[in-house]
Amino acid sequence: MHTKDLTTGSPMKLILSFMLPLVFGLLFQQVYSMVDTIVVGKFLGVDALAGVGSTGSITFLVLGLCNGVCAGFAIPVAQKFGQRDFDGLRRFVGNMIWLSCVIAAAVTLVTTLLCRQILLWMDTPADTFSYAYDYIFVIFLGIPATMLYNLLSGILRSLGDSKTPLVFLIMCSLLNVALDIVFILTLNMGVAGAGWATLLSQLISGVLCLYFIVKKFPILHLKRDDLRLRKIYVRKLLNMGLPMGLQYSITAVGSILLQTAVNGLGATAMAAIAAGSRVSMLLVCPFDAMGTTAATFAGQNLGAGKLDRIHQGVKDCTVLGIIISAAIFVITWFGGSAMTTLFLDTADGASVDMVVPMGHQFLIINAAFAVPLLFVNLLRFTIQGLGYSEFAVFAGVFEMVARGAFGLCLVPVLGYTAACFASPAAWVMADLFLFPAYFHCMKKQGYSFKPTKVSAATE
């Protein structure tokens, strides 16, 4: 069993040791996501790339809801682990299994039935519509597989094990690459093949994760009584999971409004943002990993009653995040064009000449605002680890308003440049809420921000 106690020892060392496997895992996850896009762009053309890219915001809305719920469900597990209440831990796991099955079934049914209408509402251009529909329908069919992996990996991380999910994710990534090549290049399945490759690889990753838990984690071996639904546990799980899921979905609504506006700019702009977004998501993987680490670190230390360690962890992550932000900007400045070119068919010179400069512009603008994005992830997830998931919803509202305003008001007037500034504006808006929210939540838990000895945070 590979659990890790985050309530003792140096916060910085613990954060780094927990975070690094997450970074590698997210990098692999983004790589196999990028493979879909690269293969589609190079072998199926710009219209296919634009079609797949245009589904990003609606996919983020739906999968963000599911993944956010899973992340929220894992927080009470981390808190119980910090308290060393293993009976309560298993009851939470048993109740979250039932809730996850219901949510996965409901979301899959609704999204597969409505995905065509959703694309119509988003004004998806006719020349990219079929590509978008073929891809997103398969992705929605795979929601149960996505939730299976995210639920199980979230449970393992809440116990301090960030390495086991990494191993299975690497295997999943390599399988995804192989299936992409087989389905698209050999079987000529088109963009649907990319979707099926993602679905099957996630399913296999989830099943392997389940097998490992059964074999190696006796702390998670459930009895019949653990699977009994209990109102107090269901209420706690829903109070944590639904706000986190809604936070992602609310944020995605703004992205959908923005994507709708971008769709009106044509296939070239759509392809540039699709390629730029993929590269950007790869570069900011450390921030995503930091957020997951912060939630687990805060959850365990809250359970142990060590609020001073939580604040020290936030300060350590801030220093680390600023260094990462500088590296992201340097990489983007010198390598952004080359990375954007990966997604395009270089034989189509006209498309490359138009899309690459626009994609690089998108990357530079977003990289310049990496520090605000750092705090969005760090503070939001720390607040969630403290048990205040409802604040994540409000942060999502701020992001939605900013992206929606750019999409509805500025993109039609200022064009592509306004679309590039939409996400940075959303991050800044969210930070204006998250900073006071963090201090409020810590004080509400009884923490005083008066200077303390360093040893108090690290003992």
Can you describe what each PLM-predicted range is?
Residues 49-109, 146-165, 272-336, 373-387, ...:
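Small-residue-rich hydrophobic transmembrane alpha-helices
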Residues 61-64, 108, 176-180, 206-210, ...:
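Hydrophobic transmembrane alpha-helices of multi-pass small-molecule transporters
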Residues 6-43, 57-72, 76, 101-108, ...:
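N-terminal transmembrane alpha-helices
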Residues 40-60, 126-131, 191-192, 233-240, ...:
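Interfacial/gating helices of multi-pass transporter permease domains
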Residues 27, 31-49, 119-126, 182-189, ...:
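Helix-terminus/linker motif at the lipid-water interface of multi-pass membrane proteins
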Residues 17-36, 138, 149, 172, ...:
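Transmembrane helical elements of multi-pass membrane transporters/channels
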Residues 70, 139-157, 165-173, 194-207, ...:
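Short runs within selected transmembrane alpha-helices of multi-pass transporters and secretion channels
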Residues 1-19, 77-142, 186-242, 298-369, ...:
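Short alpha-helical transmembrane segments in multi-pass integral membrane proteins
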